[in-house]
């Protein structure tokens, strides 16, 4: 393991797919664009295209020069195909467990034993492929409270893996917006409007911008926004207030009504039928604890 391999693992975990054949395996990584333009009206696609040069420098020593890059209006895709016996393929399959699509993958236990620098590199790979920061990502409507969002569609356990790895490098999660009925429709507003499945959305891990500087991005427009919004945050908020894990501060518990979606078949077995009044209750139940 090295930081380059860790970064590649992170990109695959964040938004990748592994297609394994009898002799060869193809890895595809998608870098989607939430918006076509940055907050200061710069073309996101141009920034990502420029960033691919740096990403190639990290990945190509592992995969060779057969890295293919394709771009559409809303995403950039990186892909490569290697023999099943190649080191990079064997390592990816060893370090990524349970699935071949990012929606079902898990981090292997070995990844929690790598060095801090490697963990940071892995988390940066995740952030480059599925994280973003925009002016609208502000907490509580509070001036300067900018946050990075890491979006995880469907994969409940990856949320916990990422949160625990962030904890390992001393980066607190500010909150998790779970794709769960108790949080996405906690007052049954949408349910009562005839939209019973409104809550079925991606999970969002939210981290204060200044805390995420430890991780950073290799995607240029994301890194520029991170630095800008971190500076703005620190003009309004004491960094001691952002550097707190949920178990280090009072947790607001709001008694929520029972939602019929709590028994939905799409929920993992261990939480199906359970009710949660706080995001921290669900996070702790699934394994994000002190």
Where are these regions (language model features)?
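Internal intein/HINT superfamily modules and their associated LAGLIDADG
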Residues: 1-290
């Amino acid at each position: 393991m090295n930081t380059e391999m860790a970064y590649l693992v992170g990109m695959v975990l964040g938004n990748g797919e592994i297609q394994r054949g009898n002799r060869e395996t193809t890895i595809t990584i998608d870098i989607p664009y939430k918006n076509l333009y940055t907050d200061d009206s710069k073309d996101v696609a141009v920034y990502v295209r420029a960033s691919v040069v740096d990403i190639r420098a990290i990945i190509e020593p592992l995969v060779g020069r057969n890295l293919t890059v394709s771009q559409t209006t809303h995403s950039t895709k990186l892909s490569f195909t290697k023999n099943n016996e190649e080191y990079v393929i064997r390592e990816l399959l060893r370090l990524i467990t349970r699935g071949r699509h990012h929606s079902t993958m898990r981090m292997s236990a070995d990844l929690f034993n790598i060095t801090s620098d490697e963990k940071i590199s892995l988390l940066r790979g995740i952030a480059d492929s599925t994280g973003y920061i925009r002016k609208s990502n502000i907490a509580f409507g509070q001036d300067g409270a900018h946050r990075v969002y890491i979006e995880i569609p469907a994969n409940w356990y990856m949320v916990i893996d990422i949160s625990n790895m962030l904890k390992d490098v001393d980066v607190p999660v500010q909150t998790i917006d779970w794709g769960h009925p108790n949080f996405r429709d906690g007052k049954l507003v949408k349910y009562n409007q005839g939209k019973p499945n409104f809550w079925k959305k991606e999970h969002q891990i939210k981290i204060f911008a200044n805390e995420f500087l430890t991780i950073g991005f290799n995607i240029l427009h994301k890194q520029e926004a991170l630095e800008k919004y971190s500076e703005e945050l620190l003009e309004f908020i004491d960094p001691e207030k952002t550097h707190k894990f949920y178990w280090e501060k009072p947790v607001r518990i709001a008694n929520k009504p029972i939602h019929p979606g709590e028994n939905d078949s799409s929920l993992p077995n261990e939480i199906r039928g359970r009710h949660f009044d706080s995001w921290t209750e669900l996070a702790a139940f699934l394994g994000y604890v002190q």
